[in-house]
C-alpha cells in the first residue's frame, strides 16, 4: 500500500497513474466523493484504464473484460464493507483476454501526444 495523501485530490492522481503505468504498483485504487473527478483525471493517462465501481460485480467485470488497472471507489456512496469487497474482487480477478483484448487495443488515441 502506497498512500498519495490528502489535499488536492486531482493533482495527487497523476503520480498514482504514473506509478501504475511504470509498473511500480499494480493495480491501483483511488477514492473520492463521487469517484467521477478522480476517474476522469486518471483516464487522461494513455496507459490507464480506471473503472468507477460501487458493486463487486462491476469490479469483477472491469478487470475481466476491460483489464482495468485502477479501481475508483465513490467514497460518499459506498459502504466500507462493500468497498472492501470491491477491492478484494478487483485484486483477485484475472483479465479474460481474447475479444476483450481486441477492444482494449482500439482504446489508445494515436498522435495525441498523451
Where are these regions (language model features)?
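Mid-chain, well-packed structural core segment of small domains
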Residues: 30-31, 36-76
Amino acid at each position: 500500500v502506497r498512500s498519495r495523501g490528502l489535499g488536492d485530490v486531482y493533482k495527487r492522481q497523476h503520480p498514482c497513474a504514473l506509478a501504475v503505468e511504470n509498473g511500480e504498483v499494480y493495480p491501483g485504487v483511488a477514492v473520492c466523493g463521487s469517484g467521477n473527478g478522480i476517474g476522469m483525471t486518471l483516464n487522461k493517462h494513455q496507459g490507464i484504464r480506471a473503472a468507477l465501481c460501487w458493486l463487486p460485480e462491476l469490479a469483477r467485470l472491469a478487470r475481466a473484460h476491460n483489464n482495468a488497472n485502477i479501481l475508483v471507489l465513490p467514497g460518499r456512496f459506498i459502504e466500507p464493507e462493500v468497498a472492501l469487497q470491491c477491492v478484494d474482487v478487483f485484486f483477485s480477478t484475472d483479465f479474460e483476454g481474447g475479444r476483450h483484448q481486441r477492444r482494449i487495443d482500439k482504446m489508445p488515441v494515436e498522435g495525441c501526444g498523451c
